[in-house]
Amino acid sequence: MPRLSPVNQARWARFRHNRRGYWSLWIFLVVFSLSLCAELIANDKPLLVRYEGQWYFPLVKNYSERDFGGPLATTADYQDPWLQRQLENRGWVLWAPVRFGANTINFATTQPFPSPPSAKNWLGTDANGGDVFARILYGTRISILFGLMLTICSSVMGVLAGALQGYYGGKVDLWGQRLIEVWSGMPTLFLIILLSSVVQPNFWWLLAITVLFGWMSLVGVVRAEFLRTRNFDYIRAALALGVSDRDIILRHMLPNAMVATLTFLPFILCSSITTLTSLDFLGFGLPLGSPSLGELLLQGKNNLQAPWLGIAAFLSVAILLSLLIFIGEAVRDAFDPARAV
């Protein structure tokens, strides 16, 4: 692992000095790691089955009922009481801590949906009978992955546009600014809702739509940095020596611009997650049935008699966004040369 430069060591020290941001980063990483392992935590399939001396791995392979002594060739339903008794009597089963997946309905409950928290459903069930904890866990993974991909794609486009405008200036900068002014003046949320209502959205289509309108946040920052550094002596010397524009942009100017850019990334990630949550809450986000924090918020609004729905969804979104804001503040302070440990 390469050692950090003295400048980056000082930045890391300033970041660690901000205890709220430092621990928020660790908590966020733990939450994200748990969400990536959602199938091992909440799943309606066994993690491992030992049946009549053979090993079975339902998480990675589909088995039929005949594989476990059943009469049908259909896919095994591990929620079937008969199959559960069959597996337990002739072997043993390793289950996830929560025996419900993102779309598993708890038919065994005796209470109407949404049902309150219980020993089986830690946070209760939603209006469709799904386990709230499982849907929050899977929904958190989708939200973070969507936010990360939107942040990366929009940042790359924004940095590229800002670099070209700031480096070349003149007509390139003029026409680029006019395009951004027109594009940023459009009602983004309404356009996303309009496009989502015309085309049946999925994860990738929704990501493409939001990237289309979300790439302008970093253009101004990168453009300003390039306009500031383009007249520095070392840039003029590189031009005089015949260094290509590509090498000057990527090797000499972009690192300076990235210092300011990195401080915005946690806030862009926070905004990206908020965008997906808002679209899901309004009903124009992920397809129906997808685990979503926004959809749980909508269910909480429509089922005020079941406060556990709204409270669980609200706390999940609030904690996730608060962690990112605290991380962003710590990163901003760490890259501020005026601050000292």
Language model features: what each stretch is:
Residues M1-S155, V159, A163-L164, G289, ...:
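Gly/Trp-centered helix-boundary motif
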Residues T125-V341:
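Alpha-helical transmembrane segments of integral membrane proteins
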